[in-house]
Amino acid sequence: MASQNITPSPTASSDSVFAHLVRAPEDPILGVTVAYNKDPSPIKLNLGVGAYRTEEGKPLVLDVVRRVERQLLNDMSRNKEYIPIVGLADFNKLSAKLIFGADSPAIQENRVTTVQGLSGTGSLRVGGEFLAKHYHQRIIYLPTPTWGNHTKVFNLAGLTVKTYRYYAPATRGLDFQGLLEDLGSAPSGSVVLLHACAHNPTGVDPTLEQWEQIRQLIRSKSLLPFFDSAYQGFASGSLDADAQPVRLFVADGGELLVAQSYAKNMGLYGERVGALSIVSKSADVSSRVESQLKLVIRPMYSSPPIHGASIVAAILKDRDLYNDWTIELKAMADRIINMRQQLFDALRARGTPGDWSHIIKQIGMFTFTGLNPEQVSILTKEYHIYLTSDGRISMAGLSSKTVPHLAHAIHAVVTRVA
């Protein structure tokens, strides 16, 4: 038979062409959930991944999101055609308005280019690749610490990653002097990654007065700010308050980038909905920026998905839906603030060694506990509490029922291991 004369492919041999590969380590954040899922303990607690949970420990789909999805389902005029490379026009326009403000001069002067992205991660990656191709300085400064994915995203985009001091372990607060010194010595034109609010993983944010000093330094050094806005409205409960740092930088007429995510504030984690906005000096430059962003996006994923962006656009453009969303958003933020207070009170009631006031001073989804890797390991092995090795816990994963268990465990490990 003809098939008997076919020369065997090299891949048909016993050794795979990929046999040289070593097993990659689990993602340090997502790996926490992998370990948690394998634990049969009935008291196990997952405080690793940044996803909101109800008081019952269940994932939450916002009521306003469910209502909009029903509307979309019943709209027979909708189809599943490709959308433009830059995404849904309404979504982009409304996303820019949400982060910059309805009266933003940059929007009114057509100096803002907004493209729909694959949540925050995808928006950061598109921004990073755009800068690597079209910006003269390929250095980006990240705070220490920062979200674990930032370094990989920007390295793979073609940028050189450097760091600036941010967190002060001794005070469990902001190392403001270190931040100013490091950015002050950065090469002119360097890109600076800034967490717009609710810094991940520390929960430590600059005050507005400190933000103004940061702005002055960045502008005086001709540095280019790149904001990561993953928690707008989720930090304080106010969409406008959480956008103030970004708006400070827009008000001075300078240029900047912002990546937005709707994972947290609309609970659309799995829909991968985000946006990248670039503020330029003129409408003409902004138009050219958009044309080049299309060339970054087209070979990467061609065009973004339609469903999640349609949900966001529907909520942002309808006054009643928008108001209902802000109520649900504030309820989520308030529950997290309440969990902070409960945990602080529980530790204080036990007389746990150390100052734990940082738990109620920090903001947003995460708390940087100050626990060291050895203490974290004991929490996991003996108390079935899962968190990242740097001591970051997701306050959204706590409930009134689980706070006592966590407080007892923290008290035990800090008493036993310094």
Curated annotation (Swiss-Prot):
Location of the protein in the cell: Cytoplasm
Cofactor(s) demanded: pyridoxal 5'-phosphate
Biological processes per GO annotation: amino acid metabolic process; biosynthetic process
Keyword Cytoplasm attributed: yes
EC number, as in UniProt: 2.6.1.1
Enzyme category, top tier: transferase
Residues that bear N6-(pyridoxal phosphate)lysine: K264
Highest taxon of the lineage: Eukaryota
Gene Ontology molecular functions: L-aspartate:2-oxoglutarate aminotransferase activity; pyridoxal phosphate binding
Reaction catalysed by this enzyme: L-aspartate + 2-oxoglutarate = oxaloacetate + L-glutamate
Family of the protein in this entry: Belongs to the class-I pyridoxal-phosphate-dependent aminotransferase family.
NCBIfam families assigned to the protein according to its UniProt record, in alphabetical order: PRK09257.1
Subunit structure: Homodimer.
Note: In eukaryotes there are cytoplasmic, mitochondrial and chloroplastic isozymes.
Function: Important for the metabolism of amino acids and Krebs-cycle related organic acids. In plants, it is involved in nitrogen metabolism and in aspects of carbon and energy metabolism.
Protein's recorded name: Aspartate aminotransferase 1
Species of provenance: Medicago sativa (Alfalfa)
